[in-house]
């Protein structure tokens, strides 16, 4: 869906925008006051509806396949990626085929590599389907441009979406939905930034579900895919809160026994002293398709570089099996 810019469209005033942001924050605080997030869990899965069209049965068959991929296989492959990245200073992501992404994502520095890790190895235990690895970026030092030629977020299309980050926060946002740049800015402010002046990068992830990516391309349903699946179909970046929002003090571990220590950033660190500045009550995943990725590279302090993806394909030794569905 791509709304037309009309004078008759209902828009919040500046005062109302500030009230909406404040209300969302207070509502979240009330929920967390009565629900202990560390004491509960969930599992979520997505299926197509018959309204998807006359190929419903074929799409359902493919979705069943996607939702039942080998959990142990993906855990093993993703662990190889995490082991290769741990200890890096930052990730460097660049685009190709018209994608202008050139972004450095600063990573948490490990104090005890034998017991700690930066990325969570996310399989199909909570979010189904498998799989991704994700982390909470360090905001300071996270700089550059994130660009996607076309992406659907919360049902809305963004054409040529471009976000420029300075120290992990959105410093400039643009898109080409409308001829009038002012209308583009309003569209982004109201829908993407959700009335915030800026948002931090709360998550950097590498989605590994190439089978889901191939399904979306095969049936030309990328615009219809729920974010639960789409976030697994390529590297993605979430603007807003981290994945550990309001649960930063609850220790979590990968199956290898290492504690995932990158659970907070410079914003959420203010949760005890200035909670209104710590949380944004927004978490929007922006996925770059594999065919627009030139490289995702782990960069180390000693100058060493390790490619995870090169020219749209997984290239780290031990991850090659992920490329099989990409031969479409």
Question: Can you name each region flagged by the protein language model?
Answer:
Residues 256-328:
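Extended hydrophobic packing segments that form well-structured cores
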């Amino acid at each position: 869906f791509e709304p037309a810019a009309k004078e008759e469209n209902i828009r919040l005033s500046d005062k109302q925008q500030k009230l909406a942001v404040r209300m969302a924050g207070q509502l979240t605080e009330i929920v967390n006051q009565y629900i202990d997030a560390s004491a509960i869990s969930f599992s979520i899965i997505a299926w197509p509806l018959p309204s998807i069209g006359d190929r419903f049965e074929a799409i359902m068959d493919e979705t069943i396949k996607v939702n039942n991929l080998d959990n142990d296989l993906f855990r093993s492959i993703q662990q190889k990626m995490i082991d290769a990245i741990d200890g890096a200073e930052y990730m460097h992501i660049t685009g190709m085929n018209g994608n202008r992404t050139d972004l450095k994502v600063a990573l948490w520095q490990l104090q005890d590599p034998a017991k700690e890790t930066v990325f969570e190895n996310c399989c199909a235990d909570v979010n189904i389907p498998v799989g991704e690895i994700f982390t909470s970026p360090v905001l300071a030092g996270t700089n550059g441009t994130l660009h996607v030629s076309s992406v659907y977020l919360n049902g809305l299309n963004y054409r040529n979406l471009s976000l420029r980050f300075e120290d992990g926060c959105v410093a400039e946002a643009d898109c080409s939905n409308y001829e009038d740049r002012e209308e583009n800015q309003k569209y982004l402010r109201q829908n993407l930034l959700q009335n915030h002046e800026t948002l931090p990068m709360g998550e950097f992830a590498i989605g590994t579900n190439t089978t889901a990516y191939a399904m979306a391309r095969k049936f030309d349903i990328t615009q219809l895919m729920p974010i639960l699946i789409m976030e697994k179909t390529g590297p993605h970046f979430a603007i807003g809160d981290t994945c550990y929002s309001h649960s930063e003090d609850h220790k979590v571990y990968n199956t290898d026994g290492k504690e995932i220590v990158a659970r907070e950033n410079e914003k959420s660190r203010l949760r005890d002293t200035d909670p209104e500045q710590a949380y944004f009550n927004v978490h929007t995943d922006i996925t770059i398709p594999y065919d627009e990725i030139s490289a995702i590279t782990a960069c180390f302090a000693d100058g060493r570089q390790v490619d995870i993806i090169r020219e749209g394909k997984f290239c780290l030794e031990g991850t090659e099996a992920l490329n099989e569905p990409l031969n479409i």
